[in-house]
Amino acid sequence: LAYPLGGHFHIPHGLSNALVLPHVLGFNASVAAPLYAELAPLVLGEQLRAGGVLQQTEQFIGALADFSVRSGLPTRLRDAGVPQDMLPTLARDAMQQQRLLVNNPREMTEAHALAIYQVAY
């Protein structure tokens, strides 16, 4: 979902990924939580609180979102200059990136992409 942000608004690729990453991870959590929980100790270290897979997944996603905040990066699409009326166009264009979407652990439709952009807005 990062590519259309760069294509339309010239947002640097790393920033465009940071803007959508927590939301994409949240979307994928229903199928990828065990993988995210496995990564949680590597990201959080001693800050990881005890809990099951879902709790560790939430902590992992939260830690990645917090990294953007602590880095001073914009954390919402609106903060990066994306107009709200462009979200449907971004979702449509994101569906053109099939070489990337096929690697996503959960099938993503245009409606899913739009919902993610709306949450990220």
Regions found by a protein language model. Name each.
Residues 1, 10-11, 97:
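Generic hydrophobic alpha-helical membrane-segment signal
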Residues 2, 21, 64, 68, ...:
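Short alpha-helical scaffolding segments that buttress acidic/His motifs in well-ordered protein cores
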Residues 5-86:
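Gly/Pro-rich interdomain helix-loop hinge
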Residues 83-121:
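Short, amphipathic C-terminal "tail helix"
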